[in-house]
């Protein structure tokens, strides 16, 4: 128990205790329950074990529960289960490990070297297997440190990573609110004097959620279904610990003695609103798998961490030299990718090893710049600083020409509602345009695109990032240059505004 508050922290029990000559105790079916400050329960059980008691005790005292707690020991064929609350009927996550040691004085749990199938396996190669409704995890070697005073995790380390699969990402990550209609607006209450007062605020949480960072290190590969979509040196996920989940009603034993949880005890999706059963269901998202070869480290974030995660906003980062992305025919290379779940915004940033952000799509559009921020809620992508873009343009006789545009002061790209199609682009500052028939300089350039042509039914490639066909070019400011006419004769241009509508005649 916590001596200051009286809160239950830890329970230990075993079906059988056998004293040994060296002062240790062999235990059968030992079980330890950790009571977390957020209401969750961690239960660690094993087939057998050997423990050292914190105080000298007789066998009778041990059997009667008066012999104190083990100070340290070792357990074999261990199962660790995470429950949402003490009365939960089933665990949310289950971890299986062949052998673990524990030390209640230092609150440390770790894998130990063991003989498996006649061979000595080092501690960092003992398999660690985790399964849950939406999660599968495989790695090797475990070191866990517990904060007994605060009732929370201090650190967790998997020595060698292998695989993490999230079968349904929408049930694990918080739901985004990128659509304005889904944003939460504080309720306002009218007072008697006609003024409007803000809604009353909830009472402070006496069990605040802890912000953690999970760091997957070395040779990171991300797959969506069977398709590889990203590679990086490191994957970082900033998130909050789970909120307290209270049971709606106490569980009642049935005549057989088994615990029956009330229907409301079944864990619901914590991030997705419950919809009527008649509501149309979207196709299930593909599972996401992360593979890596180095360590997985989980630890609390520093209190002064800038832009920390919130309950609705987890932060996912890919860091590499460089980070490479590929999906639906589109590719990107950058030094760092930052994704925020609340608004589904994406930032592609440079690094010392990858100073330029490069993007290409399956339709021939390419972009080079120093930084890109995609804001799905506003339907725009902002390219910072100077850059270069290349766009396919319809040419004579059905051929495709390339228009190259350079700029100095940034570019704003307009996206379709689903963020998959480029509809427009505005280039600012010392803009230059180069095309087989056009050579121009301007202060600003606006480009408008036709929607991409529909693909045949057999072509399942997604339109993500497609720019369609350039329909109009509008140059403003100090516009100068030349344009070739149909006879390839140059015509000099000097104006404040120039608009070119691009298309083909019936002859192509």
Which residues are covered by each model-predicted region?
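Mature-chain termini and adjacent capping regions
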Residues: 1-508
